[in-house]
Amino acid sequence: MSSVVVVGAQWGDEGKGKITDFLAQKADLVARYQGGNNAGHTVVVKGKEFKLHLIPSGILYPDKTCIIGNGVVIDPGVLIEELKYLESEGISADNLRISGRAHVIMPYHRRLDEVEEERRGANKIGTTKRGIGPCYVDKIARVGIRMADLLDPEEFRARLEQNVAAKNELLEKIYGVDGFDAQAIFDEYRAYAERLQAYITDTSVLLDDARKEGKNILFEGAQGTLLDIDHGTYPFVTSSHPIGGGATVGAGIGPTTINKILGVVKAYTTRVGEGPFPTELNDEMGDLIRKAGHEFGTTTGRPRRCGWFDAVIMRYSVRVSGLTCMAVTKLDVLDQLPVIKICVGYRYQDEVITHFPESLKKLAQCEPVYEEMPGWMSDTTGCRTMEELPEKARRYVKRLEELCGCPALLLAVGPDREQTIELGEAF
């Protein structure tokens, strides 16, 4: 038995979907442990692109059990649309299981997300307005509705009526917008419950049984380390824990059951939304990387902010997630660059710092200290072994390993499942 956690080591969008899909070949179960449909992952199999938001990437394999864990917040309407999408592509979701402890995104969560972001004005945090944050707020406030509650009409109605009364007062009196009809929501979500009932179970027991049977388990995170509610660039963060430790809480398994934690990191850096970004390139080079890497959000379509690789960030991710290895993605995006820069530290006032600062104000004042490396100026998309890579590309990867203190396990040289270089075994 082996358990591997896949986490984003930057600000999300690192290519976790592709890496999870690749590793899922040798896994028996694939479990998603946090986030919601604010995150998207794209998987390319034999040139065919699949875009998913809630269902784990492992669903593309017919023999894998896929789990949506208790740490995920679920919009049932979105989930059902995703099931229909997979069905239209000839992919069965019979092996999907959903934790009854996962919290449910309600229509009032989406409305609150929208009006609160509008109220912030210039201080907006860049939410996707899909109700993720407000759903997690209700979870912490202990007034949330869980998937298991949807299956109990009496319990669901009681919780819903109480919540709608409170949310309507907030929406109407504070934000000046219309509230909701509890009966309409009840009818809509009971229909969702009927559709999803067969998938809902105690997934913690399922995972524990699999562990005892010696099966390989892959845990899939969403977003990235720097979007973690505690360890990210607060307040420009998500509402959950994308770091390695989030897997144990969000899937209902003990920390001693984890064998490897793999951090997925791009060969450069991107960010969506607001907040400081020390290596950001607001010039032609940034545009070039954005176009070459097709850097537009899976969920929002927003253009991603692009910059050079930041080793300060990666060392931070190694520390807070306990990364044992890394997967470097989109190495091919750098194929035609004559010079490539790596941020090795930050210049703050009169000193150079090598640790990621806690203060957002301090981070915003940091200037990157760069180390330059020669580009390889050749196509890597057909490479399948380390030896096939150009020497300068191999040197670049080696330097990233040295600066981050983390060995590379996988290299991605294109979006397709086959465009992956294995340097070691995950399971």
Curated annotation (Swiss-Prot):
Provide the species name: Heliobacterium modesticaldum (strain ATCC 51547 / Ice1)
Q: Name one GO molecular function term.
A: adenylosuccinate synthase activity
Q: Any idea which positions bind Mg(2+)?
A: 13, 40
Keyword Zinc among UniProt keywords: no
Q: Where does substrate bind?
A: 298-304
Give the co-factor note: Binds 1 Mg(2+) ion per subunit.
Which reaction is the catalytic activity of this chain? IMP + L-aspartate + GTP = N(6)-(1,2-dicarboxyethyl)-AMP + GDP + phosphate + 2 H(+)
Q: How does it assemble?
A: Homodimer.
Alphabetized UniProt keyword annotations: Cytoplasm, GTP-binding, Ligase, Magnesium, Metal-binding, Nucleotide-binding, Purine biosynthesis
Spell out the protein name for this chain.
Adenylosuccinate synthetase
What this protein needs as a cofactor is:
Mg(2+)
- Where is this chain primarily localised? cytoplasm
